[in-house]
């Protein structure tokens, strides 16, 4: 999504959008590192000219701050939608977001409400990190706290879901999406899931969404 963007379906409910203008994954969910057993993903700040540090990201939907003390060292913030929102898995539900590593979070007071598309944070290096990024986790429903999961006792929100099932990527440029099933919203009814294109190893994909948000064009950006 882009700054100040709002997307409201014909039924009056917001469409949940991906919080960054460029999608560049640096660590996937699961695996054998700090995300083992979780559905958390790390994203780099990115722009038309490459890496962006302290990169702005925006409220995926209108949401309220429900926890600002989950991990003080990493400045974790948990937000909950103020109403049900449309999700790429075809459901309408409440949703919670955990954002981490912002060195200067703009909000700390529980109960603060931020409108969809407004600034909600920045990529950063707060806490135990190896570089500037956004640590992102999404959970379905109202905020229910967190949990430690095997095999490494890593933390995630309870009722976590895949980020690509929670955020549409309208007006987001996909630079490195690990071939996950990222989808755009064409409203008023969320489209069915589309199988990911089988790109070869080393292929990066860029997805351009036009202003109507109903069409998309995928091209190979470059082949390693």
Predicted regions and their residues:
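Short, surface-exposed polybasic-aromatic patches that bind anionic ligands, especially phosphate groups
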Residues: 220-224
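Active-site scaffold segments
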Residues: 40-43, 116, 121-122, 133-139
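Polar, enzyme-active/binding microenvironments
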Residues: 9-25, 34, 67-72, 116, ...
